[in-house]
């Protein structure tokens, strides 16, 4: 399955929810879903009855798009979550939250997960003192993510860090802004994930 390269705002309208795919734009009145809250397309404003399967599918697609994950990898994450102790749906969200690119985004080094993924791939960070370029790497408690010295003058990163107060940092992470460093204080819990996600619908979809 190819990665989506079309307009990001169209995806938010399709899912009927803010996915925060466009960085700072998503926090302004320019956000597409704030201006047009109905789905895109000729029949977007029409009322369409959606089946239970359709509701489950849309929820899965929404979460995939929030984190920028392709279907095969997302299915793999679900299978891993299903083998773990605890609640499968919550385990899935924890796996997604612990991705290195998501942690870089959550700490404020980037205004979107896609931007954070690019920063990781281009080698802008170290993890526990070692250069890292794998966006899907899973962090653990005690890990330290730091921006490399030569990357600290990148304007986009500095501007993103300035806006981190508005976006907020989850309690399981800690940012030392002046040191361009973030620490994983603990593993995320369900309360840390404030996006409107109904993970049980995804469990029901994959359990069919």
Swiss-Prot record:
Q: How does it assemble?
A: Part of the 30S ribosomal subunit. Contacts protein S5. The interaction surface between S4 and S5 is involved in control of translational fidelity.
Q: Which Pfam families match?
A: Ribosomal_S4 (PF00163), S4 (PF01479)
The similarity comment for this entry is: Belongs to the universal ribosomal protein uS4 family.
Q: Ranges for the S4 RNA-binding domain? A: 98-159
User: Keywords, A to Z?
Assistant: Ribonucleoprotein, Ribosomal protein, RNA-binding, rRNA-binding
Keyword RNA-binding present in the record's keywords: the answer is yes
Which superkingdom, per the lineage? Bacteria
Disulfide-bonded cysteines: none
What InterPro entries does the record tag this protein with?
A: Ribosomal_uS4, Ribosomal_uS4_bac-type, Ribosomal_uS4_N, S4_RNA-bd, S4_RNA-bd_sf
Q: Which Gene3D superfamilies match?
A: Ribosomal Protein S4 Delta 41, Chain A, domain 1, RNA-binding S4 domain
In Swiss-Prot or TrEMBL terms, this protein is called Small ribosomal subunit protein uS4
UniProt record, GO biological process: ribosomal small subunit biogenesis; translation
PANTHER family in UniProt? 30S 40S RIBOSOMAL PROTEIN, SMALL RIBOSOMAL SUBUNIT PROTEIN US4M
The protein's job, in short, is: One of the primary rRNA binding proteins, it binds directly to 16S rRNA where it nucleates assembly of the body of the 30S subunit. With S5 and S12 plays an important role in translational accuracy.
Please give the GO cellular component terms listed in this UniProt entry. Answer: small ribosomal subunit
Organism expressing this protein natively: Citrifermentans bemidjiense (strain ATCC BAA-1014 / DSM 16622 / JCM 12645 / Bem)
Q: Does the keyword rRNA-binding apply?
A: yes
One of the entry's Gene Ontology molecular-function terms is:
structural constituent of ribosome
